[in-house]
Amino acid sequence: RRVIPEPTCEAMATAMEKAQSELHKLGIGAVHNMDGATSFEALQLLRNTGRLKIRVTQSIARDNLDDAIDLGLSSGFGDEWLRIGPLKAFADGALGSQTAHLLRPYEGDSRNMGVAVASKEEIAELVGKAVLAGISCAIHAIGDRANRDVLDIFESVKAESAQRRLRHRIEHAQLLHPEDVRRFADLGVVASMQPVHILTDIPVAERHWGRRSRWAYAFRSLSKSGAMLAFGSDAPVETPDPIRGVYAAVARKQLEGTSDSGWYPEERMTVEETIRAYTAGSAMASSDELTRGTLARGLSADMTVLSRDIFSTPAAEILDVRVVGTVIAGQFVFRDGI
């Protein structure tokens, strides 16, 4: 029985207005929102009253897909502040709960291969329906079996997706079988990943996945294969702070206790590659690369000002970099001493 009432649209809008100010302090000017209908209603309220000061791509929950199709909504509909994004659905669970769907059993538990939240056939039906309606798809997949299944599904709709110019993505792509790494590039599927998880997941991955962890958070391998990488935070599961995410991708170390070379250092990214994945990569994930994501003539004047040149900052000092200014649409929405 539900005891705590759901927040009203007005209450959620008020909370969002405060939250966007906190995101501005972290240098964030755009987000991909995975929350549901009330959240979208609140965002529209902020937009219609001139209070939305962060760019939002709003996903469509599985339960709302039919309603969205009936209304004729498709990915990309909206304006520069609030746009319809992809269908969001789940293929499996998570690492910590040992419910990520694997090709082989978890270490020390020969009967557990994780959980398929929905069958491959169910997800294929959802994706097919979305594609025909002009809606791109973002499917949560953590385990190597879940990632393989979702790649198979995206392969089955490759022609229809290309015809409608839809760009699909796998959310997390956390553990991959090496044979599937190249498929992201071959299929044009975006690997939407959250480097900040590394800061807490290293011992858990080692415990549950063992030597398979070599292919966990395979940033470098995906990048070398030609895959599009889009980095984010998975907030509120992790902090939305992108500086911590940059550190995680570049150093691949916990804040304490990891070797100096990092965890599977062959998968480390450079600062430039990481920043590109957080900016241009995330814009590409939502098919917004022609309007934002890079500093170029004709694109939105959105930028983050840092306390020092992060590109020349040693990995060990990245966490010392501070955001001193955030500019959206050519206007400062946050500044600290500049």
What are these regions (language model features)?
Residues 1-71, 85, 89-146, 159-162, ...:
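Divalent metal-binding segments
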Residues 14, 127-138, 145-168, 172-173, ...:
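His/Asp/Glu-enriched, well-ordered alpha-helical/loop segment
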Residues 26, 79-82, 299, 319-321:
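Structured loop/turn residues at beta-strand edges in well-structured enzyme cores
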Residues 66-69, 201-205, 262, 336-338:
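Short, charged, surface-exposed secondary-structure boundary motifs
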Residues 66-86, 176-188:
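Short amphipathic alpha-helices and their capping/turn segments at secondary-structure boundaries
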